[in-house]
């Protein structure tokens, strides 16, 4: 099992004096259940696990009473160990299937804060927005979980190389031996992506298993569309989801409704886009032509790009074979750029860097991401390889003179005045590397 960084956040949650019941959000199969079980086994004397989509009787308990002591007592009868305050982690999985259990968290917070309760659900984001029940606003803690990062993948694949990776503490170029080995590991990660079951197949060098598992996950997502949306909305969700590869195949990546379906209009597909966002399956990045703080005030919500939650899923959704990453075929060059952008976004978001805007100046220049950091706006350009020609970042610098410019590419780590080149495989270390800029 991967050593997930979110375990540290869970440990901090456990020790908080003002701890509330936890709602862990995240797309299906990013590893929420396995992480919570490991956390319960390692950090508590006991772990009581209930899956509310499989155990209908458990949901009945929440329907019949709102008293947390009575709920705890009845749940204890269903486990081999008593559920004890401070000593037991109570895990309520797939809680979106039991709205009464979500509502009950208010009473757990107010009346029995000594009990550690962690809730998870693949479609909790949808439940918050669309189910007709009372959500316990202010009575729960939230935590977001994402696919396995490259750094987590690297630790499992090569512990020694991971130690070096985490020890990088300057902007000096990496020695060739480390750069080359990290590049090789990164190629493996880009093929598999970060869905835990898939990434583990890659660790085991089971390439056939990688492809099969990715296809199975995509099939599960398609079934979710049908199960959790009306027939009309499910059809539109599927159209948007399947259009993702063609949306990113264009040079400017801007979302075009005509690629979803001929004659499609925004008002018909807005709900489908929102559904995919709330389910954690896509990221939406809006145009911001005036990169001033706060970026939110200058965004154009009508012009945007969408990306997948995971670069491995995007590759298979686009029907690209793993060999594409090992080829220098110019036909694949443009889509390599899209996959590189998707990876950088995935890495930044997972590591706590809000990345929801890009910059463009007409049709002449575009910077893939701009990130607000305090009172500064940092432009971030993404290149998939070692060919880094292009004038967009130069044009941005000429117009706005930012304190820092970042380019991600497969060139070595380098600092030149206010410009920093970060190898794609070091994106997980972006926050630390920015801190080394003087």
Regions from the PLM with identified roles:
Residues 200-371:
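Accessory nucleic acid-recognition modules appended to NTPase machines
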Residues 24:
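Hydrophobic anchor at the beta1->P-loop junction of P-loop NTPases
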Residues 128-249:
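Interdomain motor-coupling "hinge/lid" segment immediately C-terminal to the ATP-binding subdomain
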Residues 91, 116-122:
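Structural recognition of the conserved hydrophobic beta-strand(s) that form the central parallel beta-sheet
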Residues 32:
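Conserved lysine of the Walker
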Residues 54-85:
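Short glycine-rich substrate-engagement loop in P-loop NTPases that contacts/grips substrate
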Residues 35, 39:
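Hydrophobic positions on the alpha1 helix immediately C-terminal to the Walker A/P-loop
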Residues 1-15:
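N-terminal pre-Walker A segment at the start of P-loop NTPase domains
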